[in-house]
């Protein structure tokens, strides 16, 4: 079982090296940078919703619903944090 896992890990490692060697390194690097930025944004996420969320109903706008940290007001349907 451990040998299969090691073979799988090594295969993925060598395929990633080959991807870089085949001239796709630039694309691979850009994908890695984008993933790094996304993770950075998730770690340092804003605590307040964007200003326009005060005028939108949370449940109808996915981005506002995401930033609505205190939840949606059940009476108005808008963010309680704004």
Curated annotation (Swiss-Prot):
Expressed by the venom duct. Residues 1-23 form the signal peptide. Keywords: Disulfide bond, Gamma-carboxyglutamic acid, Hydroxylation, Secreted, Signal, Toxin. Disulfide bonds join 53-68, 58-72, 64-79. The modification 4-hydroxyproline is found at residues 49-50. GO terms for molecular function: toxin activity. The modification 4-carboxyglutamate is found at residues 60, 63. GO terms for cellular component: extracellular region. It is found in: Secreted. Residues 24-46 form a propeptide. Belongs to the Pg turripeptide superfamily. This is Turripeptide Gsg9.1. The lineage of its organism: Eukaryota, Metazoa, Spiralia, Lophotrochozoa, Mollusca.
């Amino acid at each position: 079982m451990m040998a299969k896992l090691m073979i799988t890990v090594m295969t993925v490692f060598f395929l990633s090296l080959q991807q870089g060697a085949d001239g796709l390194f630039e694309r691979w690097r850009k994908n890695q940078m984008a993933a790094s930025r996304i993770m950075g944004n998730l770690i340092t996420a804003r605590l307040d919703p964007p200003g326009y969320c005060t005028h939108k109903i949370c449940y109808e706008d996915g981005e506002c619903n995401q930033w609505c940290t205190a939840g949606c007001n059940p009476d108005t349907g808008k963010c309680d944090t704004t």
